[in-house]
Amino acid sequence: MTDPQIHLDLMPHGIADEFIVGVDEVGRGPLVGDVVAAAVILPKGCELLLKDSKKLSESKRELIAHQIQQEAIDFCIATASPDEIDSLNILHATMLAMKRAVEGLNNPIKKVLVDGNRCPNVPYECEAIVKGDGKVPVISAASILAKVHRDQQMQVLHEAYPEYGFDAHKGYPTKLHLEKLSQHGLIPGYRRSFKPVKNILQLLEKI
């Protein structure tokens, strides 16, 4: 749905330090839209109050995301599209988005720290940390950037299709979302390989 990479490099040229990268993703569960990953390099001694994005209010997430973008040495936000999700499956599409995020960084990388239990296929030392978004600040920063970016996608979708309520459910398969989907049918961006969407498609084929 979007450019698969958005990145910013704030590191002065000529500095050859290798950096620790934090990576996280958002959007594996929704029925619609991209899966989004972010990779972040923070400066040493960064004093941002970071925590798991899911534990922050939307307004607080947006504020901290702006601060991260201002203070990060480098960051990249990357996506895998609904078509890629349907083609690859959600796990492999998520790994692809993470790989794109890491590859979008423009600084030397020493190690990659990923939230979860699996690392993407990147040519660096990589450690997966279960619940890392609540334990490791640089992963928390990636979680916040990814969450804010995906929520912004859902707001754009809400403005185009307000009858679906994307501003409320963010694309997740809530009761409200399933009711709206049954009522209004599919629009571009739905993940056709996901069971609730498949069910709607099968019902439409019978009409």
Curated annotation (Swiss-Prot):
Nuclease in keyword set: yes
Protein name listed in UniProt: Ribonuclease HII
Coiled-coil regions listed: none
Pfam families membership: RNase_HII
Gene3D superfamilies linked: Ribonuclease H-like superfamily/Ribonuclease H (3.30.420.10)
GO molecular function (one): RNA binding
Natural source organism: Hydrogenovibrio crunogenus (strain DSM 25203 / XCL-2) (Thiomicrospira crunogena)
Subcellular location: Cytoplasm
GO biological process: DNA replication, removal of RNA primer; mismatch repair
Swiss-Prot/TrEMBL cofactor(s): Mn(2+); Mg(2+)
Gene that produces this protein: rnhB
